[in-house]
Regions:
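Short, solvent-exposed loop/turn segments at conserved positions within beta-propeller repeat blades
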Residues: 90-91, 132, 181-194, 238-244, ...
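N-terminal secretory signal peptides and thylakoid transit peptides that target proteins
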Residues: 2-20
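A short loop-to-beta-strand structural motif that recurs across blades of beta-propeller domains
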Residues: 94-96, 135-137, 196-198, 245-247, ...
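Blade-level signature of beta-propeller repeat domains, shared across WD40, Kelch, NHL, RCC1
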Residues: 326-354
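Blade/loop signatures of beta-propeller domains
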Residues: 31-61, 353
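Blade-edge beta-strand/turn elements of extracellular beta-propeller
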Residues: 56-68, 104-111, 142-154, 198-216, ...
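Beta-rich, blade/repeat-based domains predominating
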Residues: 68-84, 111-130, 135, 153-171, ...
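Short loop/turn segments immediately following beta-strands, especially the blade-tip
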Residues: 249-255, 346-351
Length: 354
C-alpha cells in the first residue's frame, strides 16, 4: 500500500466522497439549534429504521447543540469523577471542557500536541493521542504529563488517533497517520511506518503492535464483555481500493487478536457510502458510530446491532467524527461533529467507563 501524504484527508474526501451528497437521502429537518425555536417531539432526526431501535429512542427529548466554534472537533471522553466532558479541537491545538453542572464550556488545555482521541483510565486520568508529537500521553492528577508511548521498535509513531482502555490496565490505540499528512492537524512528513493498532501493557508499559491489516485504523471500542475489538477503517481517504467498513476481532487473553472479519458496512442503500470515524458500544452490544462525508440524511450517528444490522440514525447538520456516552447516569450521548458539540439522551448506557 502506498500512501499519498501530499493530500490531507479533508481535501481528499471532498474530491472522492463528496459526490455522494447528490444521492437521495433520508428526510432531515431544517432546524434551529439556537434554542429559540424548539423542535416538536418526537424529534424526527432521531430515526428508527428497525423496531429494535425504538426502545432506545426517548420520544420527549431532542438533539441539542451544546457548543460551536471549533475547527474540527474530535475525541469526546467523559470524566465520571469530575462530571465533565473533554474533547479536542485539533487545528486550534486545544482540549475543550463542558461542565455537567451548569453547561459552562472552556478551554481546558492549550498546546495539546494537536490531540485527536481522548479517554480516561481506571484512576480517572486523561489519556490523549497527540497528532503532532506522535505520542500517547497521560495527564497525572498532580498536573504532570507522562509519555506512555512514542516509539515502536525504535521508530517514532506516526500520529496516534483514538484510544480505549481494558480492565487489565492495557491501553489500546490506533495510528492511521493523519496527523503527519497535513499542517491543519499536525505537520507534514512521510509516514514512518505502516498504519496499525497497538497495545500498551498496563503493568510493564511495553508497546506491542496487535494488527496492521487495516488501511487506516481509526476509531475503536471493545464489546461490553471485552471479548471483541471493533475498529473503523477510514482507508478510503488515501487508498481508493479500501472499503468503508468496521472490522472486528476476537480478543485473546486481553492481549492479542484473532479471527478478523467485517462487522459493519457503511453503505446505505440508495443513499451512499460514507466513513465510520469513531464508535462506542452500549451495554447491549450495539455500536453507535460517528459517520459522514455523504451529506444530509446520512451524516450523524448510525446505530448497528452486534450482528451488523443498521437499526437507527441520529441525523446531524454536520459530519460526526466521534462520540461517547456520559452524564451522571451514562445515558447521554455526546457527539463531536465538525465545528460543534451535540448531545441527546437515549434509553441505554455506554458499555464502558467512557
Amino acid at each position: 500500500m502506498t500512501s499519498t501524504p501530499d493530500l490531507n484527508r479533508r481535501s481528499f474526501l471532498g474530491a472522492t466522497l463528496g459526490g455522494a451528497a447528490a444521492l437521495p437521502a433520508l428526510a432531515q429537518s431544517q432546524r434551529d439549534f439556537s434554542g429559540h425555536n424548539p423542535v416538536r417531539y418526537p424529534d424526527s432526526d432521531i430515526v428508527v429504521l428497525d423496531k429494535k431501535f425504538a426502545k432506545y429512542k426517548i420520544n420527549n427529548t431532542a438533539i441539542h447543540r451544546l457548543h460551536t466554534g471549533m475547527q474540527w472537533a474530535e475525541g469526546p471522553a467523559w470524566c465520571g469523577s469530575g462530571h465533565y466532558l473533554v474533547w479536542s479541537d485539533i487545528p486550534n491545538d486545544r482540549h475543550m471542557r463542558w461542565l455537567e453542572e451548569d453547561g459552562h464550556v472552556s478551554v481546558l488545555r492549550s498546546n495539546a500536541g494537536n490531540t485527536n482521541g481522548n479517554t480516561f483510565d481506571w484512576e480517572g486520568r486523561q489519556l490523549s493521542c497527540e497528532h503532532n508529537t506522535g505520542r500517547v500521553v497521560r495527564y497525572e492528577h498532580n498536573g504532570k504529563t507522562t509519555v506512555l508511548a512514542d516509539k515502536w521498535q525504535g521508530k517514532q509513531l506516526n500520529a496516534p488517533n483514538d484510544i480505549v482502555v481494558h480492565p487489565d490496565g492495557g491501553i489500546w490505540f490506533t495510528d492511521p497517520g493523519y496527523g503527519i499528512l497535513g499542517f491543519y492537524e499536525g505537520h507534514v512528513e512521510p509516514l514512518r511506518m505502516k498504519e496499525a493498532v497497538y497495545r500498551i501493557d498496563g503493568k510493564t508499559g511495553q508497546l506491542a503492535m496487535v494488527t496492521d491489516e487495516l488501511f487506516k485504523p481509526n476509531g475503536l471500542c471493545f464489546s461490553p464483555d471485552y471479548k471483541m475489538l471493533y475498529v473503523c477503517d477510514t482507508g478510503h481517504t488515501h487508498y481508493p481500493q479500501a472499503a468503508n467498513i468496521i472490522k472486528v476481532w476476537d480478543v485473546v487473553d486481553g492481549r492479542t487478536l484473532r479471527n478478523s472479519r467485517q462487522a459493519v458496512s457503511m453503505d446505505l442503500a440508495g443513499k451512499g457510502s460514507g466513513l465510520a470515524d469513531g464508535l462506542r458500544a452500549d451495554k447491549d452490544g450495539n455500536l453507535w458510530v460517528g459517520a459522514g462525508w455523504v451529506g444530509p440524511g446520512y451524516d450523524g450517528v448510525h446505530i448497528f446491532t452486534p450482528a451488523g444490522e443498521r437499526i437507527g440514525m441520529i441525523l446531524l447538520p454536520e459530519i460526526c467524527a466521534n462520540l461517547c456516552f456520559g452524564g451522571s447516569k451514562g445515558n447521554r450521548l455526546f457527539m463531536t461533529a465538525s465545528q460543534s458539540l451535540y448531545t441527546v439522551y437515549v434509553e441505554t448506557q455506554g458499555a464502558h467507563i467512557t
